[in-house]
Curated annotation (Swiss-Prot):
Protein name: Carbamate kinase
Catalytic activity: hydrogencarbonate + NH4(+) + ATP = carbamoyl phosphate + ADP + H2O + H(+)
Alphabetized SUPFAM superfamilies for the sequence: Carbamate kinase-like
Family statement: Belongs to the carbamate kinase family.
UniProt keyword Nucleotide-binding present: yes
């Protein structure tokens, strides 16, 4: 049986540091990423793809902000912006990957699923919004918007004021069974983009909430739901490190999950960046996954072969 791998693409798969985020720039980056994924598929792995959406949701929110202030066009809520980003990014990845596979003589269906992720309406994150989203404002404008729209706003590292939203823990994907059926039918599925659209269950119905879900933690849930053997989180560094950015910096290669959990609890991994990646890797292996990998996007194939990156094992 071929091994099934969930590949979680970081922001650098779409937009490199210093780039403006034009369509042409993003498509060029996506084409490079598609080459890596196509090579993994050519080597016989079953692949499911998920991705981040931070800069793209930021762009959508800016577009809405400009449309509302300049033309009176009603802005849509945050969950809608998340769904829009899944369509935008998914379209680019599925097109580039299908083209790359065809170049190699591989005929496969590639499809994007707009995915909803259930979160607990009583998650403590809803009481403490921390995730900055959208444009920067001066203090006066930010506080005016907070009053008008019921937003929570905070000063963001001296750069201005921003809206902050909750980042609740993902529980499961509404479309999990559909995704699994497609994967088992040989379809390459792109799902849970940006962590999925956050929804809560209430009175037997689901409804969107204004929040952002960490895409690596949601990717871990996806990996469990499709019975993946491997979770591979691709980013812009070579893996996880102890004492990162200091003289004592030590890159981790192959680490048993209990040891990795100890490092996590000791606070070695920053909350907004490597922390969720390491937590996702720990959860996946503890919940029965064969291994989890954190590696550089450009070294995905080598990482899958165990030659680079951080490999978390049982």
């Amino acid at each position: 049986m071929p091994e099934r791998v969930v590949i979680a693409l970081g922001g650098n798969a779409l937009q490199q540091r210093g780039q403006k985020g034009t369509y042409e720039e993003m498509m060029e980056n996506v084409k490079k990423t598609a080459k890596q994924i196509a090579e993994i598929i050519a080597r016989g792995y079953e692949v499911v793809i998920t991705h981040g959406n931070g800069p793209q949701v930021g762009t959508i929110l800016l577009h809405m902000d400009a449309g509302q202030s300049l033309h009176g066009i009603p802005a849509q809520p945050m969950d809608v912006a998340g769904a829009m980003s899944q369509g935008w990014i998914g379209y680019m990845i599925q097109q580039a990957l299908r083209n790359e596979l065809r170049k190699r003589g591989i005929e496969r269906e590639v499809v994007t699923i707009v995915t909803q992720t259930i979160v607990d309406k009583d998650d403590p994150a809803f009481e403490n919004p921390t995730k900055p989203v959208g444009p920067f404002y001066d203090e006066e404008t930010a506080k005016k918007l907070a009053k008008e729209k019921g937003w929570v706003v905070k000063e963001d590292a001296g750069r201005g004021w921003r809206r902050v939203v909750p980042s609740p823990d993902p529980k499961r994907h509404v479309e999990a069974e559909t995704i699994k059926k497609l994967v088992e039918d040989g379809v390459i599925v792109i799902a849970s983009g940006g962590g999925g659209v956050p929804v809560i269950e209430e009175d037997g119905e689901i409804k969107g909430v204004e929040a952002v879900i960490d895409k690596d933690l949601a990717g871990e849930r996806l990996a469990e739901e499709v019975n993946a053997d491997i979770l591979m989180i691709l980013t812009d560094v070579n893996g996880a490190a102890l004492y990162y950015g200091t003289e004592k910096e030590t890159w981790l290669r192959e680490v048993k999950v209990d040891e990795m959990e100890r490092y996590y609890q000791e606070g070695h991994f920053k909350a907004g960046s490597m922390g969720p990646k390491v937590l996702a890797a720990i959860r996946f292996v503890k919940n029965g996954g064969k291994r989890a990998i954190i590696a550089h996007l450009e070294k995905a194939v080598e990482a899958l072969e165990g030659k680079t990156g951080t490999q978390v094992i049982p």
